[in-house]
From Swiss-Prot:
UniProt KW keywords: Activator, Developmental protein, DNA-binding, Homeobox, Nucleus, Proto-oncogene, Transcription
Name the record gives this protein: Homeobox protein Meis1
Amino acid composition bias (Polar residues), ranges on this chain: 203-213
SMART domains hit by this protein: HOX
Tissue expression summary: Expressed at high levels in the lung with lower levels detected in the heart and brain. Expressed in pancreatic islets (beta-cells and non-beta-cells).
Gene Ontology cellular component list: nucleoplasm; nucleus; transcription regulator complex
Any one GO molecular function term: DNA-binding transcription activator activity, RNA polymerase II-specific
Region: Interaction with DNA, residue numbers: 299-329
GO BP annotations listed: angiogenesis; blood vessel morphogenesis; cell growth involved in cardiac muscle cell development; definitive hemopoiesis; hemopoiesis; lens morphogenesis in camera-type eye; locomotory behavior; megakaryocyte development
Gene name linked to the record: Meis1
Regions recorded as binding DNA: 272-334
Protein location: Nucleus
Record-annotated MEIS N-terminal domain positions: 108-192
Positions of region (Disordered): 190-279
């Protein structure tokens, strides 16, 4: 071990550790010689950075050999001190505390803790007393060794405190994440949204199988509201009546059906709404109104989402999901219907919309009217009950 520390550069001299030169005689007396100044101003060149080199060059060879002998005696005195093994032990513990990954479950992980050093001190004291005394005949060297051990001991304690603070921070951060993130709410909301999506797709597919009496009723309603007759041979025309057919979020509502006794049961209606995770009608009306007012760009900004969440009483995530579904189930079918009307020869205006445009009957519904040769055909997107947003 003495050879190991002899190779380290910071053991090259004893000037930095505070041992006075009178401790081992006065071998450094030659250092009192002043270096030769080549300049008449400024500090001596390299007088502080390299003191040994500057003085050695100014000394006779015999003086240089005496300095080397003194340094060797100082090293031997430190390496041969009874407390040096304990000093080397705590130095290695400090190294382990900074470079070894700490795993609480692994055996021997506390080898660099301060408690383990207390045990090492007890074992070392018991062993050294049986062989030789703890201190040497030089009290100044004894004091130096004790102070060095104390400094490294404080350093080990500070490292242990840093590890404790890191562990405490990680534990509190993980607990905060587990407590603050509404994971179950997010999962429930997504599950409710997926169930609602599947049911909506089924009902949308059933819209094409409407009975003939409902088709005639739709044509009559569109004739009264829009003033343009729609023959029964054409597609379905959306109507403004039948507000009772709207349920919850209203993204894909089924057509009006004859009421039964089950529909009059409020408890059953509440259970059905709760099962599907449907939003309140007031909330969906507000969001639907915003959607129709911004059909050219139905993408609310973050600030608008926050405002809509405050107005509807929903969360920003729910508002965002509603608009994602609305763009897919309301806006996209309208665009597809417009494209089909254009492909069938409907006159097209410079704004990119059919000449009939999107006609809003009393702000209750939105239908597509095709003038000219197709004025007798009412276009319906099969979205009855979706336009009642007021």
């Amino acid at each position: 071990m003495a050879q190991r520390y002899d190779d380290l550069p910071h053991y090259g001299g004893m000037d930095g550790v505070g041992i006075p030169s009178t401790m081992y005689g006065d071998p450094h007396a030659a250092r009192s010689m002043q270096p030769v100044h080549h300049l008449n101003h400024g500090p001596p060149l390299h007088s502080h950075q390299y003191p040994h080199t500057a003085h050695t060059n100014a000394m006779a060879p015999s003086m240089g050999s005496s300095v080397n002998d003194a340094l060797k005696r100082d090293k031997d005195a430190i390496y041969g001190h009874p407390l040096f093994p304990l000093l080397a032990l705590i130095f290695e513990k400090c190294e382990l505390a900074t470079c070894t990954p700490r795993e609480p479950g692994v055996a021997g992980g506390d080898v660099c803790s301060s408690e383990s050093f207390n045990e090492d001190i007890a074992v070392f004291a018991k062993q050294i007393r049986a062989e030789k005394p703890l201190f040497s005949s030089n009290p100044e060297l004894d004091n130096l060794m004790i102070q060095a051990i104390q400094v490294l001991r404080f350093h080990l304690l500070e490292l242990e405190k840093v590890h404790e603070l890191c562990d405490n921070f990680c534990h509190r951060y993980i607990s905060c994440l587990k407590g603050k993130m509404p994971i179950d709410l997010v999962i429930d909301d997504r599950e409710g949204g997926s169930k609602s999506d599947s049911e909506d797709v089924t009902r949308s597919a059933n819209l094409t199988d409407q009975p003939s009496w409902n088709r005639d009723h739709d044509d009559t309603a569109s004739t009264r509201s829009g003033g343009t007759p729609g023959p029964s041979s054409g597609g379905h025309t959306s109507h403004s009546g039948d507000n009772s057919s709207e349920q919850g979020d209203g993204l894909d509502n089924s057509v009006a059906s004859p009421s039964t006794g089950d529909d009059d049961d409020p408890d059953k209606d509440k259970k059905r709404h709760k099962k599907r995770g449907i939003f309140p009608k007031v909330a969906t009306n507000i969001m639907r109104a915003w959607l129709f007012q911004h059909l050219t760009h139905p993408y609310p900004s973050e600030e608008q989402k926050k405002q809509l969440a405050q107005d509807t009483g929903l969360t920003i995530l729910q508002v965002n999901n509603w608009f994602i579904n609305a763009r897919r189930r309301i806006v996209q079918p309208m665009i597809d219907q417009s494209n089909r009307a254009v492909s069938q020869g409907t006159p097209y205006n410079p704004d990119g919309q059919p000449m009939g445009g999107f006609v809003m009957d009393g702000q209750q519904h939105m239908g597509i009217r095709a003038p000219g040769p197709m004025s007798g055909m009412g276009m319906n997107m099969g979205m009855e009950g979706q336009w009642h947003y007021m």
